[in-house]
């Protein structure tokens, strides 16, 4: 249900929300005290219910600026060809190749969600936390998102942790389900 603490849990896992007690271990590393960029460099990334994209940049630029190497002056640097090719391949994977030069702000909300997913994949995460990846999406696009998420898990070996209210999506994706309410786990299976 809404307000059960799911997004807060994700925020705590990636370091944007402090935890009150306990610890968060990822790949044998305590991450609860680490800054967000350090957690991301370990391979733990997330997407958001409300997308975090750069609306004035085109899709390829969004992909490049999201890459972990971009902190070295992306705007003024010569972009390696292989990085641009990787960005375009991922845009193709999510179905946005034809829109790669379009400003991200001109994409539909569903396309912006796909762009954000591709941006996360640019950094080859080990685990990807997805906060309601199909919320507000056209029903015909939902099946495409499900198919891509299954492929990300099976073909790329990326573990997915998904917050989702759509039971069709949950049943299509989940190998294990946890149900939270008011910050407590009610059930798992």
Predicted feature descriptions by range:
Residues 64, 78-99, 140, 147-150:
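Conserved ABC ATPase "signature" region
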């Amino acid at each position: 249900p809404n307000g059960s603490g799911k997004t807060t849990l994700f925020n705590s896992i990636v370091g944007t929300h402090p935890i009150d007690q306990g610890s968060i271990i990822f790949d044998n590393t305590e991450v609860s005290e680490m800054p967000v960029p350090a957690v991301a460099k370990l391979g733990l990334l997330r997407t958001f219910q409300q997308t975090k994209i750069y609306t004035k940049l085109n899709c390829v630029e969004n992909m490049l600026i999201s890459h972990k190497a971009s902190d070295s002056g992306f705007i003024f640097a010569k972009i390696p060809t292989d990085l641009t090719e990787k960005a375009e391949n991922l845009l193709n994977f999510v179905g946005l190749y034809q829109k790669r030069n379009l400003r991200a702000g001109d994409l539909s909300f569903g396309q912006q969600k796909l762009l954000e997913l591709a941006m996360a994949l640019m950094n080859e995460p080990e685990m990807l936390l997805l906060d309601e990846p199909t919320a507000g999406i056209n029903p015909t696009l939902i099946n495409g998102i499900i198919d891509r998420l299954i492929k990300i898990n099976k073909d790329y070996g990326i573990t997915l942790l998904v917050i989702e209210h759509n039971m069709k999506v949950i049943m299509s994706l989940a190998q294990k389900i946890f149900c939270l309410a008011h910050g407590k786990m009610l059930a798992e299976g």
